[in-house]
A protein has these predicted regions:
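Accessory, non-ATPase domains that flank or precede helicase/AAA+ motor cores in DNA-metabolism machines
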Residues: 1-282, 289, 294-310
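Glycine-rich phosphate-binding "P-loop"
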Residues: 118-119, 142-152, 252-253, 315-330, ...
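Short, flexible helix-loop junctions that flank or precede catalytic/ligand sites
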Residues: 158, 329-334, 339, 388-389, ...
């Protein structure tokens, strides 16, 4: 039997990872191929490649299939090829990076079965037109929507209503979230009202579940809801009908290592290639997204009111220039501390957000101005009062707090900047 000439994208960091082999395989198959003295994985791009200009006797044969559980379909392969070109990343390596660990004996796949209760809510006068507008475009090919709704406006209930429409039509839904810790609240909500299996896909899911889910979703005949982070974008879902990206502005959708892609943008491309609608949701859309939709590159929907009788909190910006300086309270102001005390008197809770750890940003000699820096990173060492140490935020080097300046011997060392420990000290004294 004559072997086919295969074009394979191998898992290598080479700019041109497309290599020619002989063997029996089909487009989209995952195979093992020899490269030098190594055997590496790859994906078949063409099962009838041209061998013109090559000596067929010198063309090596593939070692065999890597797995029969996973096969990359044409639409998914088109997405990989677009990403490889757009982000300038080797195609074979891109595919391999997105795959789950290949297992020989995967366990049974875990999932949450929805209860399918009747909706206990009705969309309000602001949500209903948004839902109807998107609903009218659900089954008309590719469309792009931005749902710009203030916090508490009920975007989740619009999503849920859209899910039900798509799932009832026999198609599946992919719901993308930026962080793992957001999945539980959505599973609890969606599982009440949707009578379909709900699968999770993120880094806390076992390798066995990931591998099984890849094999399952490409053969789906029944609709499912998949909730996941950016890596779930590559799942080869057979009958996908809708993609929703919640909190589209979140930086966690950007991958900073290996292929540095933005999952939001890749999700839009995936929807375009599969000719299905996509909804981006946010209370604070990114500037590029907002500009794109406001300039007519998609359907722009707004929710400006909170659900029920709840109102938006009152925001007040305190100008420190008009406040009397109190060194004991710095960086807090008298007004801030007074507001905190009043809230506690009313038995209310208070959250103080501080985006710095430790007691101070750095130590400085009062006499000569010497700053204590990390010998490895040359960055300022942050002071932690509770442990009485200086610590580097990059390499995590730790050193006891010095008693004097190494340059001039002065023993008066000043704390500069502030962190959570200093704020805690101030509030405990008050």
């Amino acid at each position: 039997m004559t072997e086919n000439v295969l074009l394979v994208a191998a898992n290598t960091p080479f700019n041109n990872s497309l290599l020619t082999y002989l063997g029996e395989a089909q487009k989209g198959d995952l195979v093992e191929v020899p490269l030098g003295k190594r055997v590496i994985p790859g994906i078949v791009l063409d099962e009838n490649a041209s061998i013109e200009g090559l000596d067929q006797d010198k063309v090596k044969a593939i070692k065999g299939p890597l797995t029969e559980q996973i096969k990359i379909k044409d639409k998914d392969l088109d997405l990989y090829q677009w990403m490889a070109n757009y982000y300038h990343y080797p195609l074979g390596q891109l595919v391999w990076d997105s795959l789950p660990k290949i297992l020989k004996r995967p366990r049974e796949l875990k999932f949450t079965q929805g209860e399918g209760k009747e909706f206990s809510f009705t969309l309000n006068e602001e949500q209903r037109p948004v839902f109807e507008d998107i609903k009218n475009k659900l089954f008309s090919g590719f469309s792009k929507h931005l749902l710009h709704g203030v916090t508490g406006s009920g975007k989740s209930f619009v999503y849920l209503s859209l899910f039900k429409e798509v799932l009832n039509s026999g198609k599946s839904v992919l719901f993308l979230l930026p962080e793992i810790n957001l999945t539980k609240q959505f599973v609890n909500l969606f599982s009440q009202y949707l009578n379909v299996p709900i699968y999770l896909y993120h880094s806390d899911i076992s390798n066995s579940d990931k591998y099984c889910l890849w094999g399952k979703v490409q053969k789906l005949s029944e609709p499912v809801l998949i909730i996941g982070v950016r890596s779930s974008l590559f799942l080869p879902i057979n009958n996908l009908g809708l993609i929703i990206v919640d909190e589209e502005h979140d930086a966690s959708f950007k991958q900073d290592d290996r292929c540095t892609y933005n999952a939001r943008d890749v999700a839009v491309k995936k929807a375009s290639l599969q000719r299905i609608p996509i909804v981006l949701g946010s209370a604070t859309p990114s500037l590029e997204t907002l500009n794109s939709f406001q300039s007519g590159q998609g359907h722009y929907h707004t929710l400006n009111k909170r659900m029920g009788n709840s109102t938006l909190p009152k925001l007040e910006l305190i100008d420190e220039r008009g406040e009397d300086k109190d060194e004991e309270l710095w960086p807090l102001t008298n007004k801030t501390v007074d507001e905190i005390q009043q809230a506690l008197t009313r038995n209310e809770q208070v959250i103080v957000f501080i985006n710095r750890l430790g007691f101070s940003n750095y130590l400085m000699c009062r006499n000569c101005g010497h700053k204590f820096t990390c010998p490895n990173c040359t960055l300022s060492l942050r002071y932690y009062k509770k442990k009485d140490v200086l610590k580097c935020q990059v390499c995590e080097l730790k050193t006891p707090r010095p008693s004097e300046c190494p340059d001039c011997g002065n023993m008066k060392l000043l704390n500069r900047g502030f962190g959570t420990e200093r704020i805690q000290d101030i509030l405990q004294k008050k």
